[in-house]
Structure formats: C-alpha cells, structure tokens
C-alpha cells in the first residue's frame, strides 16, 4: 500500500464515476467520464492533467458537486454527494469547498471591494460583513497572499495575477475541506503563476487543505504531490 495514502484519510473519493451526455447527430452518447475511480488524501495537492476533451473539467465538475454523474459515487469526506438535495449540495459547496476559476470574471465581483470579495463566502453563509472576526480573517488572508493594505480598492485595479491571489484568499476564507482550482494559471505570466501555485501548495502543506487542480500545463502540475492523467474520459 502506498504510504502516502495510508497515513491520511480520504478527502475526496470517486467510485466508478461516469458522465454521459445526450446523443448527438450520430446517435451515439458522448461519454465525458468513463468508470473513473480514485482517492485523494486529505491535505494533499493533486493535479489532474490531460489534453483538451480528455474529461478533466468534467472530473472537476462532478467531484465538486457542480454536476451530477450519470452513475457512480462521489464523496467529500464521508458525505455521499449523490444522496444530497440541491439545497444541501449548495450548502456543502458553500461551507466545505473553495473554488478558484480560470476566468477573473468568474472569480471576483467588480462592484465589491477586494476585501469584500474575500469575505463574500462568509457573508453568504450568514456572517455580518462588518463583524470584527470576518474583517480580521479577510485582512489576514490578504496579507498572506501579498496584498496587505489593498483591501479597500476594486479588483479591476489589480493585475491578473493579483486577482488570482485574491481568488485564492477567497477560496480559503471558509477554511474549506477541499479547494478545486480549474486552470488557475492559464492566463498568467510565469512569475504570477508561480505565486498562485505556491499559495495553493502552501494551503495543502501548511493548512492541511486538500487541493485538486485541473491544468493542461505540465509545469503547473509539477507543483502537485500527485498527478492524475486523463485521456478519453478515463484515468491512465
């Protein structure tokens, strides 16, 4: 047995997960995921790589509860996502999962300040935006991602790399069980990408968060503890 897996509990499990889409003109189903099984240990940084159309984005969507598989089981910790109602699934994503997307437009709300963007998940969960603990957590995370003193500005005043660092801070603000990152460095220059990848790796090694990153970039994948390769909807 792999020692790395044996000493840690599972943060994420997929068992025989398949995702099939509706028939196209050819009359055949499109199989985006084909009987995928894997276990991601708690506190690890895992990269999922593969060419365009390999199924890696569908893997992330099913693993994060953004899409329901056609068959198979997905668990976050001990929670089977298949048994959850849409409302319960929304609460789980809000409370136990953090997200970092490739698009800055998806990551941040331009009408909110940088600090308000960071603490937004806490506010959506019912915290008062002006509460001392909420503000302190937001400022502490901005300091950690190298943006101390910038919280009062708008995200549009930041570079793409700085916006992604804000997105990482927001993903961590709820102290999630799992952070899912979808091509988080795809539009960044090498220096900015390195900063973002360092923050994700630090979240796993320092905080014990489980990070699952989808990427087409082998350099980015090299920052992870484990690399899963997808091709044709299957893990290779």
Where on the chain are the PLM-derived regions?
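Helix N-cap at the start of a conserved alpha-helix in ABC-type nucleotide-binding domains
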Residues: 190-192
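ABC ATPase NBD coupling module
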Residues: 81-98
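Conserved ABC ATPase signature
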Residues: 154-158, 162
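Short coil-to-helix segment of the ABC ATPase nucleotide-binding domain corresponding to the Q-loop/switch region
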Residues: 110-120
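Conserved catalytic motifs of ABC-family nucleotide-binding domains
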Residues: 175
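Catalytic Walker B motif of ABC-type/P-loop ATPase nucleotide-binding domains
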Residues: 179-182
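Conserved ABC transporter NBD signature motif
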Residues: 72-80
